[in-house]
């Protein structure tokens, strides 16, 4: 129980989520260590059950035959996973998320469809139209995590932007997207975008269509607090996640905002056994400061333990991804579902 002990060590500052026979419940107001007592004036005395949800991320899925991708989506829905996710990269050969998620929506009826969507490098009006129409066609099943893109120089070049501009471009674009999705006619003259008497139709089925954010730098955490609807980091420990959650909520208070306590999730990579040398090297390149086994559980018990620790840290949405593609996707989903879906509420 390494992860849980770390979180509870921080209990006086970060607080606790208590459990009941009905599921995961926010701690009562006045409970010692209540998370929402971190000096932010938020009153969550009307406690509510945390809705635990599990999605599945298909990274590098561009090599999948279309029949297998279709079956993967059908299996996810049949097994009662909450969502399927396609990260966006420019050069890795993965599916284009807008195209593939349109197909996923057509293959399913209830499965939510999501992407880590790169905003910098896109035209705001076109992106607003594309996402609004995908949400409309999927009958309100679209989920979006807005990202600036990978730090790799080739990826940045493929976006057609200057690396140092990406955060500012996203900051300027997000309010434009929200106004367009709300049905406004938009005029805007900014550093990166010029918009004149612009509006879109049809509007998204979801009102509002939410934008979640990731990231770990202080600027990224402040961005979530300032303009985000939710936060979903990756490649960090539950202890680090608890600290980041606190920073997001403190930032939100500075901007007179509240982040819904249900809107904290994590990108969680797992392995079916000891990490391969390639997987270890890849993880160490991204996080050289930490043992990869602290980030990636390598057994069913380890996966359940780290999920438990993330729940204790106040996170309730999980995007699960195998560290390497399985030999059989259907069998992998069956096994994964048997391990985690009993926690879904």
Regions found by a protein language model. Name each.
Residues 80, 104, 134, 177, ...:
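Conserved, mostly hydrophobic/aromatic
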Residues 77-78, 101-109, 131, 135-141, ...:
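Acidic (Asp/Glu)-rich catalytic clusters
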Residues 52-58, 84-86, 113-115, 142-146, ...:
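Hydrophobic faces of well-ordered beta-strands that scaffold small-molecule active sites
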Residues 35-108, 207-209, 323-326, 331:
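N-terminal beta1-alpha1-beta2 module of alpha/beta enzyme domains
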Residues 44-49, 159, 163-204, 234-345:
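An alpha-helical appendage that flanks or caps ligand/catalytic pockets
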Residues 97-114, 173, 334-345:
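Alpha-helix-loop-beta-strand connector modules within alpha/beta enzyme cores
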């Amino acid at each position: 129980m390494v992860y849980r002990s770390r979180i509870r060590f921080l209990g006086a500052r970060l607080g606790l989520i208590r459990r009941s026979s009905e599921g995961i419940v926010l701690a009562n107001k006045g409970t010692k260590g209540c998370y929402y007592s971190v000096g932010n004036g938020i009153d969550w005395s009307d406690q509510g059950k945390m809705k635990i949800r599990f999605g599945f991320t298909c990274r590098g899925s561009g090599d999948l035959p279309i029949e297998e991708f279709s079956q993967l989506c059908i299996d996810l829905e049949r097994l009662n996973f909450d969502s399927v996710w396609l990260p966006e990269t420019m050069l890795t050969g993965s599916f284009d998320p807008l195209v593939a998620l349109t197909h996923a929506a057509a293959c399913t009826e209830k499965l939510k469809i999501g992407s880590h969507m790169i905003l910098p490098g896109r035209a705001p009006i076109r992106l607003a139209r594309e996402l609004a129409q995908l949400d409309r066609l999927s009958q309100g099943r679209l989920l979006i995590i807005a990202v600036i893109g990978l730090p790799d120089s080739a990826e940045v070049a493929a976006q057609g932007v200057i690396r140092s501009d990406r955060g500012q471009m996203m900051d300027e674009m997000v309010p434009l997207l929200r106004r367009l999705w709300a049905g406004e006619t938009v005029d805007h003259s900014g550093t990166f975008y010029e918009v004149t008497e612009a509006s879109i139709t049809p509007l998204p089925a979801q009102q509002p269509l939410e934008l979640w954010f990731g990231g770990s730098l202080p600027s990224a955490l402040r961005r979530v607090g300032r303009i985000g609807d939710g936060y979903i980091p990756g490649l960090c420990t539950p202890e680090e996640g608890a600290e980041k959650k606190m920073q997001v909520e403190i930032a939100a208070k500075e901007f007179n905002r509240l982040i819904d306590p249900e809107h904290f999730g994590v990108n969680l990579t797992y392995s079916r056994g000891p990490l391969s040398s390639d997987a270890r090297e890849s993880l160490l390149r991204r996080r050289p400061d930490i043992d990869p086994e602290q980030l990636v559980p390598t057994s069913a018990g380890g996966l359940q333990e780290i999920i438990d620790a993330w729940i204790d840290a106040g996170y309730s949405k999980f995007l699960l991804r195998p560290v390497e593609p399985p030999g059989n996707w259907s069998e992998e989903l069956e096994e994964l579902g048997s391990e985690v879906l009993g926690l879904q509420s």
